[in-house]
Amino acid sequence: MNETVLRCSGLGKTFRQGKVDVPVLRSVDLAVGTAESLAIVGASGSGKSTLLHLLGGLDTPTRGDVALLGKNPFALSEAERCRLRNTALGFVYQFHHLLPEFSAVENAAMPLIIRRVARAEALARAAEVLDAVGLTHRLAHRPGELSGGERQRVAIARAVVTRPACILADEPTGNLDHHTADTVFDLMRELNRKQGTSLVVVTHDVELAARMDRQLRLVDGTLQAA
């Protein structure tokens, strides 16, 4: 039986706009198993990114519970929540958010450096992961010297360098051309299978979503089978 890495129940989020409460998520139930790959699709503005932020402990739900490796991140102090996030999760976004003044290997090593891993070890582990994503020849290059696909591969390396239990990816290929998007998506699936890391991807691309183990659609604030 697959263990559950990430779970939420009755998850809801309401935003205040002027004097009106606007519910974005109503009652979301989800369980992500070890090494499972899951795609969440839905219309623009349906709340996909909001859901990912709640699952990652980056935003606070209005109601409901989240459990990451059996721990409720919202019952922890801010420092404890950051530690849990940094050890258990990796994040990939549509825009790479790489630090322009640092090289590819330094960017990929950043989560380890934040965890106070010795710099030499952090860089060695980052170089190993960059090799796995086909960027051995780009270690010393800064983001401005890389193509869009290469920058996104560095972002993926940064997400997996800590060997997280789960990767949360928000439109990771949305800013790439079709061929590059295909390559990046295949890379994420390969790392998912080889490392046994769970993968939750928010995407508008139904073709890419179909290549995941499971697909769900966010409609009217709830998840449905796609």
Curated annotation (Swiss-Prot):
GO cellular component: plasma membrane
InterPro entries found in the cross-reference section: AAA+_ATPase (IPR003593), ABC_transporter-like_ATP-bd (IPR003439), ABC_transporter-like_CS (IPR017871), ABC_transpr_LolD-like (IPR015854), LolD_lipo_ATP-bd (IPR011924), MacB-like_ATP-bd (IPR017911), P-loop_NTPase (IPR027417)
Domain of life: Bacteria
SMART domains given in the database record: AAA
Membrane-related topology note: Peripheral membrane protein
Gene Ontology annotations of biological process type: lipoprotein localization to outer membrane; protein localization to outer membrane
Enzyme class: translocase
Function: Part of the ABC transporter complex LolCDE involved in the translocation of mature outer membrane-directed lipoproteins, from the inner membrane to the periplasmic chaperone, LolA. Responsible for the formation of the LolA-lipoprotein complex in an ATP-dependent manner.
Stated family: Belongs to the ABC transporter superfamily. Lipoprotein translocase (TC 3.A.1.125) family.
Record-given protein name: Lipoprotein-releasing system ATP-binding protein LolD
Organism: Thiobacillus denitrificans (strain ATCC 25259 / T1)
This protein's encoding gene: lolD
